[in-house]
């Protein structure tokens, strides 16, 4: 267990009696602490913060290693302090803890607003609902922070971006599909100023090629909350293995299976008391979820099809079928399953409101609340940010028309995605500090949940508990989260689905003889070791986010495992290039002595670097 506790409290500047308002205290080790013990820990946190600020007034965080644990403290808002305790064995990874802790707060503020604007009693409840599940899920995954790539250790505003071949060829023209979306969605007479922005992401499920993963584009350069929205979306995909309506609605969670809970109980030599609250919640769940459960039972037992009359009155679900049930023929999806609204007012009204609309606090010119819809087309996820005063967004005819325009635009994208596919004998990461964008070919971690994994499962809040209660099956392995999708079936029968150039006629991935990364064949444990090595290298440099008068710094290291690592940093970007000099197949040729350190990595690296070194974000 990596994370031990999380604390959030308010300590006003004019506080004279040295007391504070405790808003959240959660011990993830399940230890029960008295009020005095909690106050002692808060006293340690406050003392650490004051001591660190005596030496530097500009720090927005404090990190210290104690005897039994390490601690991070952030001032997330004026007088609001967020602290995280974690095991000393993971202390070398503390920059990743810092970034994730800061992002956890950012996700809270995006969904609920600033803490200072929320009444304390309400705030305490919201903090428990957000922070506790967030860190409980992380603790369920062994070596979670060790598996995170180095980009998660630099800055909380860094988010992954797709890489395109034309950018590397010094071509920066706006593509046809971007023009189409801009003219027909954002600048149309009906939508102008009502749809604030459209953010487009490519999040393939296979996660084999990091160059094709992440943010693609948005259209408003004043959208300052883009890093937070992007990291929230990528975080859902990484934790749950996919982006679904349930994940976007916040009703999906990762939990241990009953078998794993029993194993944990045996190891602890004691049984957990029955959760009376869970039983009571199951009995008192909303009738709408019960109807969904009955529908599922009807599918399983072949009875009670009378509910079809009710469901036909609502937009249809992509019904309860999994690939394992459909056989080999399910590899190729029907056209109607290729695209759908994930979050929209067209989702069934008996679902929680978060399935119809997400309301996020975002910053353009100012900080305000906006409505967000989510739409998917194959591996593309589109976030549509809408002004809250725009009422037509709830009309079915408008949403059908909007989907038509999104479909046309993304279809143009799939006709020629233009991803960078050139084979490289090295890997790299380029981080642009001001924009928060990073481009990488190094494999990134993604949670690969499957039915053979008996330790963890995905569940949907409310619905899975109901199915377990009504079917009297405590060991129900399958979850609604793994076999269903909430989406409005709005089939555009007049338009064929464009084929993906990266897939064959049967819908499966084409095999490419050229590897996208020199580390593409690493297993999970090897990827952990790679990230450990890279964190050691980053730890030898000053983790500077942005400073205007810095000179360019560079460093070259040769590691015992055959890796040659080049590190360059200036006020604009941070560059990391990795090459395996044990298996470098390029012929070594003598050349004139050069003052450029990067040329020692080989001609392939220097040629690539000279082509992209002066670029803006790719």
UniProtKB/Swiss-Prot annotation:
Ranges for region Disordered: 490-517
Single GO biological process annotation from the record: autophagy
Any single GO CC term annotated in Swiss-Prot or TrEMBL for this entry: vacuolar membrane
Membrane topology classification: Peripheral membrane protein
Keywords associated with the record: Autophagy, Endosome, Membrane, Protein transport, Transport, Vacuole
Keyword Membrane attributed: yes
Basic and acidic residues bias (residue ranges): 502-515
InterPro entries: Ccz1, CCZ1/INTU/HSP4_longin_1
Domain of life (superkingdom): Eukaryota
Keyword Nucleotide-binding: no
TM segment ranges: none
Main localization of the protein described in the UniProt heading: membrane
Subcellular location: Endosome, Multivesicular body membrane; Prevacuolar compartment membrane; Vacuole membrane; Vesicle
Job description of the protein: In complex with MON1, is required for multiple vacuole delivery pathways including the cytoplasm to vacuole transport (Cvt), autophagy, pexophagy and endocytosis. The MON1-CCZ1 complex acts at the fusion of vesicles with the vacuole, through its regulation of the SNARE complex during the coordinated priming and docking stages of fusion, and particularly at the stage of tethering/docking.
Protein family membership: Belongs to the CCZ1 family.
Subunit structure: Forms a complex with MON1.
Protein name in UniProt: Vacuolar fusion protein CCZ1
UniProt source species: Kluyveromyces lactis (strain ATCC 8585 / CBS 2359 / DSM 70799 / NBRC 1267 / NRRL Y-1140 / WM37) (Yeast)
């Amino acid at each position: 267990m990596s994370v031990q506790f999380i604390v959030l409290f308010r300590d006003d500047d004019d506080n004279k009696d040295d007391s504070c308002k405790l808003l959240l205290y959660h011990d993830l080790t399940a230890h029960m602490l008295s009020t005095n013990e909690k106050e002692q820990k808060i006293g340690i946190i406050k003392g650490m913060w004051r001591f660190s600020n005596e030496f530097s007034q500009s720090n927005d965080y404090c990190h210290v290693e104690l005897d039994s644990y390490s601690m991070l403290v952030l001032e997330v808002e004026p007088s609001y302090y967020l602290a995280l305790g974690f095991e000393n064995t993971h202390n070398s990874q503390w920059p990743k803890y810092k970034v994730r802790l800061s992002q956890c707060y950012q996700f809270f503020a995006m969904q609920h607003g600033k803490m200072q604007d929320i009444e304390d009693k309400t705030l305490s409840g919201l903090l428990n609902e957000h922070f506790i599940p967030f860190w409980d899920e992380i603790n369920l995954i062994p070596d979670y922070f060790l598996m995170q790539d180095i980009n998660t250790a630099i800055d909380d505003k860094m988010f992954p971006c797709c890489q395109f071949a034309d950018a590397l060829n010094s071509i920066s023209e706006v593509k046809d599909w971007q023009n189409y979306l801009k003219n027909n969605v954002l600048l149309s007479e009906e939508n102008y100023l009502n749809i604030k922005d459209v953010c487009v992401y490519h999040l393939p499920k296979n996660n084999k090629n990091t160059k094709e993963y992440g943010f693609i584009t948005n259209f408003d350069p004043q959208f300052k909350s883009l890093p937070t929205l992007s990291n929230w979306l990528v975080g859902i995909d990484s934790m749950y293995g996919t982006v679904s309506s349930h994940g976007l609605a916040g009703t999906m969670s990762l939990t241990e299976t009953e078998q794993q809970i029993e194993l944990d109980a045996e190891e602890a030599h004691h049984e957990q008391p029955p959760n009376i609250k869970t039983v009571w919640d199951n009995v008192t769940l909303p009738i709408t979820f019960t109807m969904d459960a009955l529908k599922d039972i009807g599918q399983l037992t072949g009875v009670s099809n009378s509910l079809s009359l009710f469901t036909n009155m609502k937009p249809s679900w992509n019904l309860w079928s999994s690939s394992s049930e459909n056989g080999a023929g399910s590899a190729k999806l029907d056209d109607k399953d290729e695209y759908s609204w994930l979050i929209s007012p067209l989702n069934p009204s008996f679902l929680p409101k978060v399935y119809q609309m997400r309301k996020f606090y975002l910053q353009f010119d100012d900080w305000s609340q906006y409505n967000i819809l989510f739409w998917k087309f194959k591996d593309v996820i589109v976030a549509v940010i809408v002004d809250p005063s725009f009422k037509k967004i709830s009309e079915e005819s408008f949403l059908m028309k909007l989907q038509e325009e999104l479909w046309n635009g993304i279809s143009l994208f799939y006709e020629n995605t233009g991803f960078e596919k050139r084979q490289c004998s090295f890997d790299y990461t380029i981080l642009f500090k001001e924009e928060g964008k990073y481009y990488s070919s190094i494999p990134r971690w993604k949670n690969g949940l499957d039915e053979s994994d008996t330790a963890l499962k995905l569940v949907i809040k409310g619905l899975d508990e109901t199915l377990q209660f009504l079917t009297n099956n405590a060991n129900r392995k399958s979850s609604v989260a793994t076999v269903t999708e909430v989406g409005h079936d709005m089939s555009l029968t007049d338009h064929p689905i464009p084929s993906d150039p990266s897939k064959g006629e049967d819908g499966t991935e084409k095999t490419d003889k050229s590897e996208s990364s020199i580390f593409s064949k690493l297993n999970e444990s090897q990827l952990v070791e790679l990230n450990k090595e890279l964190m050691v290298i980053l730890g030898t440099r000053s983790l500077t986010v942005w400073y205007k008068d810095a000179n360019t710094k560079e460093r070259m290291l040769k590691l015992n495992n055959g890796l040659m690592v080049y590190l360059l940093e200036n006020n604009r970007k941070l560059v990391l290039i990795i090459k395996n000099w044990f298996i470098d197949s390029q012929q070594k040729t003598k050349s004139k002595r050069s003052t450029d350190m990067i040329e020692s990595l080989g001609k392939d690296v220097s040629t690539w670097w000279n082509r992209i070194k002066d670029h803006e974000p790719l």
